[in-house]
Amino acid sequence: AGTAAAFGGVSDTLTALGIPCACCDDGPSGMRLDCGTKAFSLPNGTLLASTFDRPLMTELFTFMGLEMHTNQVDCLLGPGMNIHRHPLNGRNFEYFSEDPYLTGEMASAELAGLHSTGAEGTIKHFCGNNRETRRHFLDSVISERALREIYLRGFEKAVKKGGAKSVMTTYGQVNGVWTAGNYGLVTGILRDDWGFDGFTMTDWWANINRRGKAPDKSDFAAMAMAQNDVYMAVSYTHLTLPTSDL
């Protein structure tokens, strides 16, 4: 109880298909258990990256994975690995660095620790989430070269070297398309170019759109066509079922 959400086999229909239910939890600086259960607080991402110590990072998140196992949590909503583009970004402390190489190395070391215990980490926010002000509507206009060499390089390393199997998209847009339904990012780069074969999710209650169209949180078709697997998060009160299914 008190975790961020559950996904997968959350209904009788899905469990009947053999799909297990998984539990995810914030966050990059230690587990957040809103039920009141105490958890250890970890150093933030910037401090950890300042050590340049991969083995220490792996050891720390091996411990984290064991704590997740104790609390029946399958998937950590971290590491956060956006680039320090501006010193006033409200979540810079959560992210590793302005350097994409260091970001990818530290994320890979963190994932190694989690994976050693059977836990998974979710690399986020994919991508261009480099400020907090109006981040639900932010449009990060980025050239192809800057995107691949700076803003995506750490994610690429986390996928190829770190073996990441869970990715979270952002609240905002990249070049006019909200990342929750951005085919070029989620399929073209992540899956096709990098060979990612894992699980993707949106950030919580994210906007979705098609190029040139207004955002719509219920445009799940655009999300599905982009191969973004799960919209986070919904409750039964948000679902409208056909009469025949009631």
Language model features with spans:
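Glycoside hydrolase catalytic-domain context in secreted enzymes
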Residues: 1-244
